[in-house]
């Protein structure tokens, strides 16, 4: 049978942790014409045979449902027939292939969408398993969605689409929002400000955080009376230092630090605790200017007149064009990364506050994401593609171009990236082409493309967030928070 050119010798292997999905790694011959579906049938048949043997021995008699699988050869997802793979890689049917199988990625279907009053620029989520919760003193039951909007308002949505809280203080478009803890959030916007907010979560207050503020209130800091009952959406502090719009944020709960991306060419470095930062005098507002401002701006200016101000721990200067994205290294909190319209990715030592590596690409970079388990940095560009970089490979000089892989599929700017919470090889991207795409770094094309509920791609998508409980959350010009989810989408 091994001489039959229509057959090839293979063996299956898997890294699935579920023991019930593992088959014996015994060599067998299969037709070279098989694709994913045919191979999936074979694996399920082998699993069913094993199940039958276990049932005869009295070990397990529970009925097993077929499981769809994806297949990898030499780390590459099989998207064609085995024959096409052999031809493309210059192999013959005499080869002996080891084929890895994993749970298939099923199409993410539309679940819900929530109406907002203006364009949605940024999204974040919180659930019981995220570090924003596990690093706090609170336990939570229900996941929430945080949104930032072009009307300057930050909102918290529950899973029914109800707006539970509003955070009003920004005088221009909000560009990024992040959870710090269940009772703390941070936002930034075109008004050049970073704002720390406090609130209750499902009626519960983090007593540790409240005790800190009580102690400071007793010391007479800023003359604020923080002994009062907590209010939804109260600005805890305004963080000032940027001289242009602030468009992205990153939070590290371990070190209690924040990074911000500014159009003033700076990367801001802040603390989640305002007591760690130097005070700034509260400005005296010109009554003549205030009186001629819009009603909204006048009200916000008067409110801000009593709010404490803080300066950054540091402003990291090195980019030559506006900074678009910032992240902390998930494996080393003393390292940060930033991307800019100057085409570069910079690596920052957050202890010495110095840039330690610069790598140059060919296009403006608009978003950044780390995939720590596979040692890659993904960047979205103005050239419509996504680049994958290995941060361990140092650029030989400041002008060198280091790109590992280029993922092509979007037809406009790639402005948002979010990692899969389950699969270290997967992430999602949002684009001005009106779509969200799901990617696996082992495939050269996107796995799925998500449009809006009505199938439209006319509205730009700005924000994307992939939550383990909620699913894929996206928002943009259509003023809707949309949720898509597929069974085992990334398992």
From Swiss-Prot:
CDD domains: WD40. InterPro entries: G-protein_beta_WD-40_rep, NLE, WD40/YVTN_repeat-like_dom_sf, WD40_repeat_dom_sf, WD40_rpt, WDR12/Ytm1. GO terms for cellular component: nucleoplasm; PeBoW complex; preribosome, large subunit precursor. Signal peptide: none annotated. GO terms for biological process: chromosome organization; maturation of 5.8S rRNA from tricistronic rRNA transcript (SSU-rRNA, 5.8S rRNA, LSU-rRNA); maturation of LSU-rRNA from tricistronic rRNA transcript (SSU-rRNA, 5.8S rRNA, LSU-rRNA); protein-RNA complex remodeling. Pfam families: NLE, WD40. Residues 113-491 are annotated as: Sufficient for interaction with ERB1 and association with 66S pre-ribosomes. Keywords: Nucleus, Repeat, Ribosome biogenesis, rRNA processing, WD repeat. The keyword RNA-binding does not apply. The keyword Nucleotide-binding does not apply. PROSITE patterns: WD_REPEATS_2 (PS50082), WD_REPEATS_REGION (PS50294). Residues 8-103 are annotated as: Ubiquitin-like (UBL) domain. It comes from the Eukaryota. WD repeats lie at residues 128-167, 169-207, 241-280, 318-358, 360-399, 409-449, 456-491. GO terms for molecular function: ribonucleoprotein complex binding. Belongs to the WD repeat WDR12/YTM1 family. Component of the NOP7 complex, composed of ERB1, NOP7 and YTM1. The complex is held together by ERB1, which interacts with NOP7 via its N-terminal domain and with YTM1 via a high-affinity interaction between the seven-bladed beta-propeller domains of the 2 proteins. The NOP7 complex associates with the 66S pre-ribosome. Interacts (via UBL domain) with MDN1 (via VWFA/MIDAS domain). Component of the NOP7 complex, which is required for maturation of the 25S and 5.8S ribosomal RNAs and formation of the 60S ribosome. This is Ribosome biogenesis protein YTM1. It comes from Lodderomyces elongisporus (strain ATCC 11503 / CBS 2605 / JCM 1781 / NBRC 1676 / NRRL YB-4239) (Yeast).
């Amino acid at each position: 049978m091994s001489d039959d050119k229509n057959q090839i010798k293979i063996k299956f292997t898997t890294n699935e942790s579920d023991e019930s999905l593992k088959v014996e790694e015994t060599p067998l011959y299969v037709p070279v014409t098989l694709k994913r579906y045919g191979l999936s049938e074979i694996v399920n048949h082998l699993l069913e045979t094993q199940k039958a043997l276990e049932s005869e021995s009295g070990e397990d008699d529970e009925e097993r449902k077929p499981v769809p699988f994806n297949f990898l050869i030499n780390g590459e997802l099989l998207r064609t027939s085995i024959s096409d793979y052999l031809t493309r890689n210059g192999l013959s049917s005499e080869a002996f292939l080891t084929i890895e199988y994993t749970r298939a990625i099923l199409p993410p279907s539309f679940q819900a969408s929530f109406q907002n009053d203006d364009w949605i620029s940024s999204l974040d989520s919180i659930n019981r398993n995220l570090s924003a919760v596990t690093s706090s003193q609170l336990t939570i039951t229900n996941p929430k969605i945080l949104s930032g909007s072009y009307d300057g308002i930050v909102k918290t949505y529950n899973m029914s689409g109800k707006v539970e809280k509003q955070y009003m203080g920004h005088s221009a478009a909000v560009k990024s929002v992040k959870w710090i803890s269940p009772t703390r959030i941070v936002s930034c916007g075109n008004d050049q400000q970073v704002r720390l907010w406090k609130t209750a979560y499902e009626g519960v207050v983090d007593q540790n955080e409240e005790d800190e503020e009580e102690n400071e209130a007793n010391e007479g800091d800023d003359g604020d009376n923080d002994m009062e009952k907590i209010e939804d959406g109260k600005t805890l502090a305004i963080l000032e230092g940027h001289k242009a719009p602030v468009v992205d944020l990153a939070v590290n709960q371990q070190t209690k630090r924040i990074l911000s991306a500014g159009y003033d060419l700076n990367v801001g470095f802040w603390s989640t605790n305002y007591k760690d930062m130097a005070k700034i005098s509260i400005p005296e507002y010109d009554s003549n200017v205030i009186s001629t401002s819009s009603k909204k701006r006048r009200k916000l200016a008067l409110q801000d007149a009593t709010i404490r101000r803080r300066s950054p721990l540091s402003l990291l200067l090195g980019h030559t064009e506006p900074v678009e994205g910032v992240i902390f290294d998930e494996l080393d909190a003393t390292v940060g990364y930033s991307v800019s319209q100057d085409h570069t990715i910079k690596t920052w030592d957050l202890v010495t506050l110095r840039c330690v590596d610069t790598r140059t690409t060919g296009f403006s970079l608009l978003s950044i994401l780390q995939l720590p388990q596979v040692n890659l940095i993904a960047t979205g560009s103005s050239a419509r593609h996504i680049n994958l970089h290995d941060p361990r490979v140092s650029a030989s000089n400041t002008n060198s171009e280091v790109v590992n892989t280029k993922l092509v599929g979007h037809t406009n700017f790639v402005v948002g990236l979010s990692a899969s919470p389950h699969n270290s090889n997967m992430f999602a991207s949002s684009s001005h082409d009106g779509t969200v795409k799901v990617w696996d770094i082992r495939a050269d094309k996107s796995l799925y493309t998500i449009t809006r509920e009505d199938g439209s791609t006319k509205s730009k998508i700005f924000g994307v967030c992939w939550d383990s409980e909620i699913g894929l959350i996206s928002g943009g010009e259509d003023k809707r928070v949309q949720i898509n989810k597929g069974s085992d989408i990334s398992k």
